[in-house]
Design a protein with these regions (language model features):
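A shared catalytic/ligand-binding motif for oxyanion handling
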Residues: 1-151
Length: 151
């Protein structure tokens, strides 16, 4: 099983869509989490079908930016627990021996709001004692050379 997570900074760009499609074909992920989709639900459904995924959930963009989505294959018994503009939290194989948890996460881009992101992660962590895979863009900079553009 492979999981692919990408902050695409606008999936509506044809080059970005092509690059993500190439990654999907090359790695055959069972789950794909995408942050900053900048797309509405109808377009995400079209991409789900194009990339041959069986399921999808999204929190569509608000205003000009944002948006998170998860696509998954049917072999992943994907049960969404909670979602928001910044996360999608799900239990995989719910009630089975190999039950585990996946969270796709997009941290608050505004540094003054990072505390909200960390509070959300702490709340999510406390909900279950399952094995947990949390992937995404936390919008945290550890070293100055990591920062490109933005604020």
């Amino acid at each position: 099983m492979n999981i692919l997570s990408w902050n695409c900074r606008g999936l509506g760009n044809p080059q970005t869509e092509q690059e993500l499609g190439d990654l999907i074909r090359a790695h055959s992920p069972s789950i794909v989490f995408v942050a900053e989709t900048w797309l509405k639900k109808a377009r995400l459904i079209s991409l789900r079908d194009k990339w041959k995924f069986d399921g999808m959930i999204d929190f569509s963009r608000e205003g000009r930016g944002g948006g998170v989505a998860v696509f998954w294959k049917k072999e992943m018994d994907f049960s969404v627990d909670t979602y928001s503009p910044n996360h999608i939290d799900a239990v995989i194989n719910k009630g089975k021996e190999d039950e585990w948890r996946f969270t796709g996460f997009y941290g608050e881009p505004n540094t003054n709001s990072h505390f909200i992101s960390w509070a959300t992660l702490r709340r999510l962590k406390s909900k279950f004692s399952l094995t947990w895979s949390c992937a995404g863009d936390f919008n945290e900079i550890i070293r100055a050379h990591e920062k490109l553009g933005g604020r």
